[in-house]
Curated annotation (Swiss-Prot):
It comes from Aeromonas hydrophila subsp. hydrophila (strain ATCC 7966 / DSM 30187 / BCRC 13018 / CCUG 14551 / JCM 1027 / KCTC 2358 / NCIMB 9240 / NCTC 8049). Zn(2+) 1 binds at H66, D99, E162. Coiled coil: none annotated. The active site is at D68, E133 (proton acceptor). This is Succinyl-diaminopimelate desuccinylase. GO terms for molecular function: acetylornithine deacetylase activity; cobalt ion binding; succinyl-diaminopimelate desuccinylase activity; zinc ion binding. It catalyses: N-succinyl-(2S,6S)-2,6-diaminopimelate + H2O = (2S,6S)-2,6-diaminopimelate + succinate. Binds 2 Zn(2+) or Co(2+) ions per subunit. Its cofactor is Zn(2+); Co(2+).
Length: 375
C-alpha cells in the first residue's frame, strides 16, 4: 500500500461530518511538523482550521482543502461502511475518498517527497485546511484568510484540492468559478376566501408574471471563460394547505450563478427594478456566497498543465463550471487559484469512491507543480 493510500484511509476512518474534524488536521499537522512546518491551529466557534507554513519568504505556495465531509446518507445503501475505508478491485471506497480526503493525502505526501528532494527550496509552502467547507462556510477558510490579511501574509499561488476531474485524474483543471448569490423573496398580499377574491389580494397571481420574466431573462451571454449567468428558482411556498383560502404571502427562494460579465450589484439592481416594475409589495433579502474568480494565465496554471502532461500525457481542459469552492475566499487576495483533484463522479453519493492509483498520480502531479515553482 502506498503512503498516499495509507494516509487517505487514516483520514477516511475519522467520521468528520461538518463541522467536525475528528482529528484529521492533527494527523496532517504531525506529519507536516516533522518537515519543519510551523503549525498554527485556528479555531473559530465550532470550526477547526489549520494554517501550517514552511519558510518565511515569498513566493508562498498554498495547498487548500477541507477535512469535513457530507453525511453518509442511508447506511444500508453502502457496499461497505462509509467510514471503514475499503479497497475493492483497485477502487478506494469511503466517505471523503474523492471529496476530499484523497486530495489531502496526496498533498501531504507530495510535500514530503518534494522537501526530501529539495530541503532548501525557494519560497514557502503552506496548508490552509478547514472543517467548514461543506457547511455554512462562516468560520472556515474565510476567517483564516481574514487573519492572514490582517498580518499581511499573502498567498501567491494556491491549489484547492476539490475533485475537478471528470473521467481521468487531471483531465480537468478548474481555473475559476462562477459567483453565487441567493435571493429570499417575500411577496405580500391579502388573505381571504377564494369565493370572494375582490376582498383579497392573491400574491401568487401578482408575482407569477414577474417570476416568469425572471426565468426568461437572458442575464448575459457569458464569455470565453464562463457560461451565461443562470437563474433558478429553488423553493416556492404559499397558502395554508386549505383549498378555499387565498394566501396572504408568497415565499420564493432563487439563486444566480453568475459570470464575470456581471457583478452581484448588477443582479440586485436588475431584479429589484423588475419587481418594482410589476408593482409588487415585497421584501427581498440577499445572500452573497461568493464572487466569480478566474486565473486565466500565470505561473501556477502553466506549472499545473505541465505537471499533468508529464504524469498522464494529457493536456487538461480549463473549465469554470460547477458549484462554488473555498477558492472564492482566496482569489480576492490576489492569489492565483486553481482546483485540481480526483474524479468527481461519486462525490456526495453513497459508495463514494476513487481509483486508488489515481491518488498516487495526483500526488505526482502536486509534486510536479511544486518542483516547477519552488525547486
Amino acid at each position: 500500500m502506498s503512503d498516499v493510500i495509507a494516509l487517505a484511509k487514516d483520514l477516511i476512518r475519522r467520521p468528520s461530518v461538518t463541522p467536525l474534524d475528528e482529528g484529521c488536521q492533527t494527523l496532517m499537522a504531525e506529519r507536516l511538523a516533522k518537515l519543519g512546518f510551523v503549525i498554527e491551529p485556528m479555531v473559530f466557534e465550532d470550526t477547526t482550521n489549520l494554517w501550517a507554513r514552511r519558510g518565511s519568504e515569498g513566493p508562498l505556495f498554498c495547498f487548500a482543502g477541507h477535512t469535513d465531509v457530507v453525511p453518509a446518507g442511508p447506511l444500508d445503501k453502502w457496499h461497505t461502511p462509509p467510514f471503514e475505508p475499503t479497497i475493492q478491485d483497485g477502487v478506494l471506497y469511503g466517505r471523503g475518498a474523492a471529496d476530499m480526503k484523497g486530495s489531502l493525502a496526496a498533498m501531504v505526501v507530495a510535500v514530503e517527497r518534494f522537501v526530501a528532494e529539495h530541503p532548501d527550496h525557494s519560497g514557502s509552502i503552506a496548508f490552509l485546511i478547514t472543517s467548514d467547507e461543506e457547511g455554512p462556510f462562516i468560520n472556515g477558510t474565510t476567517r483564516v484568510i481574514d487573519t492572514l490579511e490582517a498580518r499581511h501574509e499573502k498567498i501567491t499561488w494556491c491549489i484547492v484540492g476539490e475533485p475537478s476531474s471528470t473521467t481521468v485524474v487531471g483531465d480537468v483543471v478548474k481555473n475559476g468559478r462562477r459567483g453565487s448569490i441567493t435571493g429570499d423573496l417575500l411577496v405580500r398580499g391579502v388573505q381571504g376566501h377564494v369565493a370572494y377574491p375582490h376582498l383579497a389580494d392573491n400574491p401568487i397571481h401578482k408575482a407569477a408574471p414577474a417570476l416568469a420574466e425572471l426565468a426568461a431573462t437572458v442575464w448575459d451571454e457569458g464569455n470565453a471563460y464562463f457560461p451565461p449567468t443562470s437563474f433558478q428558482i429553488a423553493n416556492i411556498s404559499a397558502g395554508t394547505g386549505a383549498s378555499n383560502v387565498i394566501p396572504g404571502e408568497l415565499h420564493v427562494q432563487f439563486n444566480f450563478r453568475f459570470s464575470t460579465e456581471l457583478t452581484d450589484l448588477d443582479i440586485r439592481e436588475r431584479v429589484e427594478a423588475l419587481l418594482d416594475r410589476h408593482g409588487l409589495d415585497y421584501q427581498l433579502d440577499w445572500t452573497l456566497s461568493g464572487q466569480p474568480f478566474l486565473t486565466d494565465t500565470g505561473k501556477l496554471l502553466a506549472a499545473a498543465v505541465s505537471a499533468i502532461e508529464a504524469v498522464n500525457g494529457q493536456q487538461p481542459a480549463l473549465l469554470t463550471t460547477g458549484g462554488t469552492s473555498d477558492g472564492r475566499f482566496i482569489a480576492p487576495t490576489g492569489a492565483e487559484v486553481i482546483e485540481l483533484g480526483p474524479v468527481n463522479a461519486t462525490i456526495h453519493k453513497v459508495n463514494e469512491c476513487v481509483k486508488a492509483d489515481d491518488l498516487d498520480l495526483l500526488a505526482d502531479m502536486y509534486q510536479g507543480v511544486l518542483a516547477r515553482l519552488l525547486a
